[in-house]
C-alpha cells in the first residue's frame, strides 16, 4: 500500500472530498486507511465497567485508500507515489518532484 501511518493526505473522493488530515491507521488487507477528522461517525456505546455512562461517541471510520492522495511535503499539493531503490532499499518518492518521502510514524 502506498499510504503509510503518519502521512498527510487529501481526500479526493466521497462525502469528505477536499479535506486533509494525517493517517492514524492503515488496514492493508482491506485496502483502507483511517484519516484524522475525516469520515466521522457516531458510535453507540453500551455502558461498561471502564465507561459506566456509555453514550454516543464520535470516531473516525476507515475509507478506501483509492479515495485519498498523498500530500507533497514541500508544496502541500496532492501527488502520486512512486518507488525507487536507494542503496539496495526500496523507498517511496514524490512523483511531481522526485523527492524521497520520509516516513514519520
From Swiss-Prot:
<dbReference type="InterPro" id="IPR008991">
    <property type="entry name" value="Translation_prot_SH3-like_sf"/>
</dbReference>
<dbReference type="InterPro" id="IPR041988">
    <property type="entry name" value="Ribosomal_uL24_KOW"/>
</dbReference>
<dbReference type="Pfam" id="PF17136">
    <property type="entry name" value="ribosomal_L24"/>
</dbReference>
<dbReference type="GO" id="GO:1990904">
    <property type="term" value="C:ribonucleoprotein complex"/>
</dbReference>
<keyword id="KW-0699">rRNA-binding</keyword>
<dbReference type="Pfam" id="PF00467">
    <property type="entry name" value="KOW"/>
</dbReference>
<dbReference type="GO" id="GO:0005840">
    <property type="term" value="C:ribosome"/>
</dbReference>
<keyword id="KW-0689">Ribosomal protein</keyword>
<comment type="subunit">
    <text>Part of the 50S ribosomal subunit.</text>
</comment>
<dbReference type="InterPro" id="IPR003256">
    <property type="entry name" value="Ribosomal_uL24"/>
</dbReference>
<comment type="function">
    <text>One of the proteins that surrounds the polypeptide exit tunnel on the outside of the subunit.</text>
</comment>
<dbReference type="InterPro" id="IPR014722">
    <property type="entry name" value="Rib_uL2_dom2"/>
</dbReference>
<comment type="function">
    <text>One of two assembly initiator proteins, it binds directly to the 5'-end of the 23S rRNA, where it nucleates assembly of the 50S subunit.</text>
</comment>
<dbReference type="GO" id="GO:0006412">
    <property type="term" value="P:translation"/>
</dbReference>
<comment type="similarity">
    <text>Belongs to the universal ribosomal protein uL24 family.</text>
</comment>
<keyword id="KW-0687">Ribonucleoprotein</keyword>
<protein>
    <recommendedName>
        <fullName>Large ribosomal subunit protein uL24</fullName>
    </recommendedName>
</protein>
<dbReference type="InterPro" id="IPR005825">
    <property type="entry name" value="Ribosomal_uL24_CS"/>
</dbReference>
<dbReference type="InterPro" id="IPR005824">
    <property type="entry name" value="KOW"/>
</dbReference>
<keyword id="KW-0694">RNA-binding</keyword>
<dbReference type="GO" id="GO:0003735">
    <property type="term" value="F:structural constituent of ribosome"/>
</dbReference>
<dbReference type="GO" id="GO:0019843">
    <property type="term" value="F:rRNA binding"/>
</dbReference>
